[in-house]
Swiss-Prot record:
Record PANTHER family: 6-PHOSPHOGLUCONOLACTONASE, 6-PHOSPHOGLUCONOLACTONASE-RELATED
GO molecular function: 6-phosphogluconolactonase activity
Its biological purpose: Catalyzes the hydrolysis of 6-phosphogluconolactone to 6-phosphogluconate.
Pathway the protein contributes to: Carbohydrate degradation; pentose phosphate pathway; D-ribulose 5-phosphate from D-glucose 6-phosphate (oxidative stage): step 2/3
One Pfam family in the UniProt entry: Lactonase
Keyword annotations: Carbohydrate metabolism, Glucose metabolism, Hydrolase
Gene Ontology cellular-component terms listed: cytosol
Full protein name: 6-phosphogluconolactonase
Length: 331
């Protein structure tokens, strides 16, 4: 298996393309100059395209991914109705979802042969919209509205329109600020990192009564932490055994173990990392974690070790200015 790591640096308007080997070493392959401040990125389900959101001219750009070395070539672009904060796709590669924190909306752009062609829906009134997360069955889009302490739930129609479900939302505790999410591989649980109180909520997608329920809320900060809480990103290993979340004020990655059924998290430790870690990701083997320091202008590679999933630093690398996003592609 070959793996390519992409890092987005908006201040220098660059995407760095790296080869990741089996020992956890990165080798720089390409630096792409992007026409705008590049922030969120996602790889298409068929691994042929990288979609990125740029500002201040709000657009989604599509880059073709070379199958042999992961090199990027610009392919297409499409306008967006707000500044892109988060970007994702459905599992069939038919639609791109973009959440906009500043505009308070989520948009759906149709893909044709992997390329963005037209905007098909926009849902407004999502104050502080910070991500759009499709469930593993490709039916429900979970959209955290950070400023409203709620996660809105939409059914994705065949033509890409979003229809509010019943119930139309679930609520966090007041002042939590739901931000980013991941789903357990067993499709039964979702995990949401809350920016403003640096906690993680565990959501049972459907209990026997057909309801969505928060079954656990866990503080992700050390007991002696007293500064402003400012959580950012969350990811789970492919086997569902280890979960990680980061806080930018503390420059920490919190390590969680996940119970076998996915319902319970336990804090295993805290890993100091790059200054102000805005984004990170886990490789497809579940062996390495790559974190970006928005203020250090570096990325760091960690090996995921032992039954607890603790992190051991393997190396750090200079990237562009203000790196914010990391994605990994395997082929």
């Amino acid at each position: 298996m070959k793996q390519t790591v992409y890092t987005a640096s908006p201040e220098s308007q660059q995407i760095h393309v790296w080869s990741l080997n089996h020992e956890g070493t990165l080798t720089l392959v390409q630096v792409v100059d992007v026409p705008g401040q590049v922030q969120p990125m996602v790889v298409s389900p068929d691994k042929r395209y990288l979609y990125v959101g740029v500002r201040p001219e709000f657009r989604v750009l599509a880059y073709r991914i070379a199958p042999d070395d992961g090199v990027l070539t610009f392919a297409a672009e499409s306008a967006l109705p707000g500044s892109p904060t988060h970007i994702s796709t459905d599992h069939h590669g038919r639609f791109v979802f973009v959440g906009s924190y500043n505009a308070g909306n989520v948009s759906v752009t149709r893909l044709q042969d992997g390329l963005p062609v037209e905007l098909v829906d926009v849902v407004e009134g999502l104050d502080g919209c910070h991500s759009a997360n499709i469930t593993p069955d490709n039916r429900t889009l979970w959209v955290p509205a950070l400023k409203q302490d709620r996660i809105c739930l939409f059914t994705l129609s065949d033509d890409g329109h979003l229809v509010a479900q019943e119930p139309a939302e679930v609520n966090t505790v007041e002042g939590a600020g739901p931000r980013h999410m991941v789903f357990h591989p067993n499709r039964q649980y979702a995990y949401c990192v809350n920016e403003l109180n640096s906690s993680v909520d565990v959501w049972q997608l459907k209990n026997p009564h057909g309801e969505i329920e928060c079954v656990q809320t866990l503080d992700m900060m050390p007991a002696d932490f007293s500064d402003t809480r400012w959580a950012a990103d969350i990811h789970i290993t492919p086997d569902g055994r280890h979960l990680y979340a980061c806080d930018r004020t503390a420059s920490l990655i919190t390590v969680f173990s996940v119970s076998e059924d996915g319902s319970v998290l336990s804090v295993e430790g805290f890993q100091p990392t790059e200054v102000q870690p805005r984004g990170f990701n886990i490789d497809n083997s579940g062996k390495y974690l790559i974190a970006a320091g928005q203020k250090s202008h570096h990325i760091a590679v960690y090996e995921i070790t032992g039954t607890q999933g603790l992190l051991t630093e393997k190396g750090r690398y200079a990237v562009g200015q203000g790196p914010m996003w990391v994605v990994v592609n395997a082929y």
